[in-house]
């Protein structure tokens, strides 16, 4: 029982340490840089590299300016045509189930 309490305490401390950055506002984080140029070091010259790629990179440039949270949200909203194909491909399974149920009901 004592070991369980120690493990729970260690787990709670680790959880608190790892989640500390997620619940604090950016202004309270001590290690986080602040100011208008604070995030320049994350992706230095990235839009410049896209400009050199040519006109095919126009869509990539728009996605890069949008930011990754918006990109993930946009991608999660999209559904591809494969869902419709899968539903059409497995439609026969429903027919097989219904015909088996009808066969069980006959005397």
From Swiss-Prot:
Coiled coil, from the record: none
Residues with Phenylalanine amide modification: 95
Propeptide: 22-61, 99-107
Modified residues (Pyrrolidone carboxylic acid): 62, 79
Domain of life per record: Eukaryota
Keywords: Amidation, Cleavage on pair of basic residues, Hormone, Phosphoprotein, Pyrrolidone carboxylic acid, Secreted, Signal
Region (Disordered) residue spans: 26-65
Keyword Phosphoprotein: yes
Residue numbers carrying Phosphoserine: 99
Signal peptide: 1-21
Localization, UniProt: Secreted
Entry GO terms, CC: extracellular space
Pfam families: Gastrin
InterPro entries on file: GAST, Gastrin/CCK, Gastrin/cholecystokinin_CS
GO molecular function: hormone activity
UniProt PTM comment: Neither gastrin is sulfated.
GO BP, one annotated term: response to food
PANTHER family (alphabetical): GASTRIN
Known role: Gastrin stimulates the stomach mucosa to produce and secrete hydrochloric acid and the pancreas to secrete its digestive enzymes. It also stimulates smooth muscle contraction and increases blood circulation and water secretion in the stomach and intestine.
Similarity comment: Belongs to the gastrin/cholecystokinin family.
Protein name, per record: Gastrin
Organism: Equus caballus
């Amino acid at each position: 029982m004592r070991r369980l309490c120690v493990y729970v305490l260690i787990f709670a401390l680790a959880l608190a340490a790892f989640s500390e950055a997620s619940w604090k506002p950016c202004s309270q984080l001590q290690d986080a840089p602040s100011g208008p140029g604070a995030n320049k070091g994350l992706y230095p010259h990235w839009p410049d590299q896209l400009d050199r790629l040519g006109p095919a990179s126009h869509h990539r440039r728009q996605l890069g300016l949008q930011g990754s949270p918006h990109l993930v949200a946009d991608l999660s909203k999209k559904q591809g045509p494969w869902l419709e194909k899968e539903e059409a491909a497995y439609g026969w399974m429903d027919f097989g189930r219904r015909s088996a149920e009808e066969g069980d009901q006959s005397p």
